[in-house]
Amino acid sequence: MTEINWKDNLRIAWFGNFLTGASISLVVPFMPIFVENLGVGSQQVAFYAGLAISVSAISAALFSPIWGILADKYGRKPMMIRAGLAMTITMGGLAFVPNIYWLIFLRLLNGVFAGFVPNATALIASQVPKEKSGSALGTLSTGVVAGTLTGPFIGGFIAELFGIRTVFLLVGSFLFLAAILTICFIKEDFQPVAKEKAIPTKELFTSVKYPYLLLNLFLTSFVIQFSAQSIGPILALYVRDLGQTENLLFVSGLIVSSMGFSSMMSAGVMGKLGDKVGNHRLLVVAQFYSVIIYLLCANASSPLQLGLYRFLFGLGTGALIPGVNALLSKMTPKAGISRVFAFNQVFFYLGGVVGPMAGSAVAGQFGYHAVFYATSLCVAFSCLFNLIQFRTLLKVKEI
């Protein structure tokens, strides 16, 4: 058996996640302009731009369980390579699309073959000692956050100098680099389970520690992503409503970035704290903290105040998705960890699809402040449900 240094894998996986996060954030901000450049009429630009973004998430949600099954059968490293190389084509190929239909088709395929980040997460979760899983997965999550923050700056610079299509070529090169780094440096001593000893998916969900918590954690991932994405479509408009008329996009970008930076700062610390006090305990506290911050955001009186609240919000996010991942890692047999992470990713993707639509609908009916109130209510229900589900386990550190 090959000796694996999980810390070396963590470093490479972190950089791969950084490149993937940067690639995603490089594409999304320019989608409406690119759709317009493809000849779509002004009245349909918003629809097709939204479709190009959401179709990728929907197809990813549908195919994620399939890749999870294959990862448990053949290994997580092959799935990381598969995702990196396939997305090199589907994302880099956007530079050559002649019309909107090819754009939608490639975005659909991108979702079908996506999965670098969840497979990297499953790989590290399968190798790291259980008592350090919170810290390791928290650190790993900062790679995506750092990439997401860096991407728009790089993309804006490249787009201004060379055009939007060049940005897509850059994205393709990022993803190709992530695949090459995985091939060369990620180590996995995967031992395929004999077919007669393999755990069927139905049995896997009942063989995990505390099976009744599994769906609850999936729903928590949905709520976390739903609440985060429901704010996205209205944030710039809310900032303008608070009195910001000059440099609106710049100020809105700063507010978004402030949360990302604080999240990146806190994720590793929160992961270590979760390992020390219990990830389930910290998850409930972090959700309660989120409810308070959402309520404060709803009552912000200036863009500066909103930015401060969003920065404070980011400090708690390091205990949310990384906390869920750590709990899933500790509860699940290693032979089925990729499938469990894949199903969790389905709920995460669905939250990303439903959240923006729900946020826009609430804003249209009740105003921008109402989006934060509604979001805080959703998170409060999830927090209360988790508190009830964890009630017998709050006395112990590990579950």
From Swiss-Prot:
<feature type="transmembrane region" description="Helical">
    <location>
        <begin position="306"/>
        <end position="328"/>
    </location>
</feature>
<dbReference type="Pfam" id="PF07690">
    <property type="entry name" value="MFS_1"/>
</dbReference>
<feature type="transmembrane region" description="Helical">
    <location>
        <begin position="84"/>
        <end position="106"/>
    </location>
</feature>
<feature type="transmembrane region" description="Helical">
    <location>
        <begin position="140"/>
        <end position="162"/>
    </location>
</feature>
<feature type="transmembrane region" description="Helical">
    <location>
        <begin position="217"/>
        <end position="239"/>
    </location>
</feature>
<feature type="transmembrane region" description="Helical">
    <location>
        <begin position="49"/>
        <end position="71"/>
    </location>
</feature>
<comment type="similarity">
    <text>Belongs to the major facilitator superfamily. TCR/Tet family.</text>
</comment>
<keyword id="KW-0472">Membrane</keyword>
<dbReference type="InterPro" id="IPR011701">
    <property type="entry name" value="MFS"/>
</dbReference>
<dbReference type="GO" id="GO:0005886">
    <property type="term" value="C:plasma membrane"/>
</dbReference>
<dbReference type="InterPro" id="IPR036259">
    <property type="entry name" value="MFS_trans_sf"/>
</dbReference>
<feature type="transmembrane region" description="Helical">
    <location>
        <begin position="12"/>
        <end position="34"/>
    </location>
</feature>
<keyword id="KW-0813">Transport</keyword>
<feature type="transmembrane region" description="Helical">
    <location>
        <begin position="340"/>
        <end position="362"/>
    </location>
</feature>
<dbReference type="Pfam" id="PF00083">
    <property type="entry name" value="Sugar_tr"/>
</dbReference>
<dbReference type="InterPro" id="IPR005828">
    <property type="entry name" value="MFS_sugar_transport-like"/>
</dbReference>
<dbReference type="InterPro" id="IPR050497">
    <property type="entry name" value="MFS_MdtG_subfamily"/>
</dbReference>
<dbReference type="InterPro" id="IPR020846">
    <property type="entry name" value="MFS_dom"/>
</dbReference>
<keyword id="KW-1003">Cell membrane</keyword>
<keyword id="KW-1133">Transmembrane helix</keyword>
<dbReference type="InterPro" id="IPR001958">
    <property type="entry name" value="Tet-R_TetA/multi-R_MdtG-like"/>
</dbReference>
<dbReference type="GO" id="GO:0022857">
    <property type="term" value="F:transmembrane transporter activity"/>
</dbReference>
<comment type="function">
    <text>Efflux pump for various substrates.</text>
</comment>
<protein>
    <recommendedName>
        <fullName>Multi-drug resistance efflux pump PmrA</fullName>
    </recommendedName>
</protein>
<feature type="transmembrane region" description="Helical">
    <location>
        <begin position="167"/>
        <end position="186"/>
    </location>
</feature>
<feature type="transmembrane region" description="Helical">
    <location>
        <begin position="366"/>
        <end position="388"/>
    </location>
</feature>
<keyword id="KW-0812">Transmembrane</keyword>
<feature type="transmembrane region" description="Helical">
    <location>
        <begin position="248"/>
        <end position="270"/>
    </location>
</feature>
